[in-house]
Regions:
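Glycine-enriched loop-and-adjacent helix/strand subsegments that border the catalytic/binding cleft
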Residues: 6-8, 60, 81-84
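Short, glycine/charge-rich flexible loops or terminal/linker lids adjacent to PRPP-binding catalytic cores
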Residues: 78-107
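Short Gly/Thr/Asp-enriched flexible loops that form oxyanion-binding sites at enzyme active sites
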Residues: 66-75
Length: 107
């Protein structure tokens, strides 16, 4: 497997190189299952955004959910919000925006 070396938040990781299209490859930065990386990245990101500089925390589903959860935990935020690709039945009045994903090539 080809990898891309990265040093982030004081930690070293080897990102797997993943083919998205014939012309596009990405280093997949995935925090699922890496508690040490998630905690360290959340700590460093929170240093960049003072608590009084935002009203809400928002992230895209799904790979960043552990990171925003840890950021909320460390900052004492009671809530954070997840942007999804589509509405679910349990969402009574979702905000809807059309966008295109680079990894799935779908709207």
């Amino acid at each position: 497997m080809h990898t891309y070396p990265i040093d982030v938040a004081g930690l070293h990781r080897e990102l797997p190189i993943c083919k998205v299209t014939d012309d596009l490859y990405i280093g997949a930065f995935i925090v699922f299952g890496d508690a040490e990386l998630t905690v360290a990245c959340a700590r460093e990101l929170l240093k960049l955004v003072p608590a009084d500089s935002y009203d809400y925390m928002l992230t895209a589903e799904a790979k960043s959910i552990p990171l925003i959860h840890e950021m909320a935990r460390q900052s004492g935020a009671a809530k954070y919000f997840i942007a999804r690709k589509g509405p679910k039945a349990y969402m009574p009045d979702p905000l809807h925006v059309v966008d295109k994903s680079i990894t799935t090539a779908e709207e």
